[in-house]
Amino acid sequence: MRQTKTGILLANLGTPDAPTPEAVKRYLKQFLSDRRVVDTPRLLWWPLLRGVILPLRSPRVAKLYQSIWMDGGSPLMVYSREQQQALAARLPDTPVALGMSYGSPSLESAVDELLASDVDHIVVLPLYPQYSCSTVGAVWDELGRILARKRRIPGISFIRDYADDGAYIDALAKSARESFARHGEPDVLLLSYHGIPQRYADEGDDYPQRCRDTTRELVSALGLPPEKVMMTFQSRFGREPWLTPYTDETLKMLGEKGTGHIQVMCPGFAADCLETLEEIAEQNREIFLEVGGKKYAYIPALNATPEHIDMMLKLTAPYR
């Protein structure tokens, strides 16, 4: 009997190919066209997206990308490639592919790469620690569309999320402790998660609960008093209410109240990207310092640290 050959697909959101208005426009068009991300009726959404949002946002977002672009590309792509390579090095007999929901390399190219390696079972690990319909759900949808076009469909193991996984919490706690050792223990540790529309949660998305699960376990692992840790939500888009409290408004409030030392961690981001390196490490730093805050430090994402790769090994082990 032929032994099953398993491959691993690491999935993440994606990134523009270049920090230019044209590349950003292509990326945003694909991203904001996904009904999992924006579910506004298409008759209303298409004219707004194509006539207003893309022309106005693309040049501005391109400038933000230019401020963080690395020699090897966007930070998300650089760190995602490092994750793929590090995991592959630990699993020499298991093909590991990287696929993005939007942009390249696509999820379809990752599936094709694994099938070309003659795998008959794929472990899909979306690198979103906390499930949301707009992230993990989008990977699930696209995977279904891809496999619907294939004559040979492999077995699939799909890891929904890992918000309270012990190895994940341990990796976050180690990262936080290293930051405390470097900068001193903060007055407040702010855990900033990407937001989603409040309506999505009202309709059943358990993302807020999974964020609370991560926060609870991390506070316990660090042994911090609960009053020294705050959970907030960032990166809201559009006019409808999103999950609260908002990160930027919370930092402004803390600075105005005289909180001197803040450290910010973004547990929901597996790799540093525009939302962490520019929005949190730069924009939100300015918000806090401008209203009287004294010390602000951003704690980097887990990226390709050994502890993060250990976590990936643990999560995928039952399916390999």
UniProtKB/Swiss-Prot annotation:
Pathway it works in: Porphyrin-containing compound metabolism; protoheme biosynthesis; protoheme from protoporphyrin-IX: step 1/1
UniProt EC number: 4.98.1.1
PANTHER family given in the database record: FERROCHELATASE, FERROCHELATASE, MITOCHONDRIAL
Source taxon at top rank: Bacteria
Organism: Salmonella paratyphi A (strain AKU_12601)
Pfam families noted in UniProt: Ferrochelatase
Binding site for Fe cation: 194, 275
Top EC class for this record: lyase
GO molecular function, one term: metal ion binding
Family as reported in the entry's similarity comment: Belongs to the ferrochelatase family.
Entry's localization field: Cytoplasm
Protein name per Swiss-Prot or TrEMBL: Ferrochelatase
This protein's GO CC annotations: cytoplasm
